[in-house]
């Protein structure tokens, strides 16, 4: 098992490759209790922990340093990617299209295997929640219907008739 100091060195080296600032990286051996992740290690495993206001929100456990590093950078690159997608959003396009693409690019810069893994994780998400490029159009139309006095139920029905949800995935 690597020590916390050795893990921190590896994380900082990887963070530098993608320009990730220190304040979005985990802490090591202690929690700020602000939902900023921290890393723990003992003789048995590595732990990636999120705690807030005295409550542990999540704990990921692994004995594999590569798995720990992937978990850290899946979170870091997700935040980067969402910010990138918001700044470069294409009108009437599901923002996840750009965010997912950017995250895979960043993960691939860190490790080609991580890029592949991220791509497959996105594919699983999209099986349950396909891209919805009409979401913003539907919302604007719904609001205009409500402003015209239509009930919530009727505005929903009309908005979904004009801009239907994507088809449910098969299987």
Describe the function of each predicted region:
Residues 1-43:
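N-terminal "first-domain core" detector
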Residues 63-76:
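A short, charged, amphipathic alpha-helix used as a generic interaction element across diverse proteins
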Residues 58, 75-83:
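Amphipathic alpha-helical interaction segments
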Residues 44-47, 56:
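Hydrophobic residues embedded in beta-strands of well-ordered beta-sheets
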Residues 53-63:
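A short, exposed loop/beta-hairpin motif centered on an aromatic-Gly-Thr core
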């Amino acid at each position: 098992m690597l020590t916390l100091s050795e893990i921190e060195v590896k994380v900082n080296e990887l963070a530098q490759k993608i320009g990730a600032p220190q304040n979005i990286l985990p802490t090591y051996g202690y929690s700020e209790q602000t939902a900023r992740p921290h890393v723990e290690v003992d003789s048995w495993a590595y732990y990636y922990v999120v705690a807030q206001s005295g409550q542990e929100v999540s704990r990921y456990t692994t004995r594999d340093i590569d798995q720990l590093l992937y978990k850290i950078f899946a979170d870091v690159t997700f935040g980067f990617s969402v910010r990138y997608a918001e700044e470069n959003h294409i009108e009437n396009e599901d923002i996840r299209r750009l965010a997912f693409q950017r995250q895979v690019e960043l993960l691939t810069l860190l490790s080609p295997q991580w890029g592949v893994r991220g791509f497959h994780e996105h594919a699983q998400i999209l099986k349950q929640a396909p891209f919805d490029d009409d979401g913003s159009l539907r919302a604007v139309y719904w609001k205009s219907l409500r402003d015209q006095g239509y009930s919530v139920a009727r505005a929903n029905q009309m908005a979904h008739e004009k801009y239907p949800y994507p088809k449910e995935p098969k299987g």
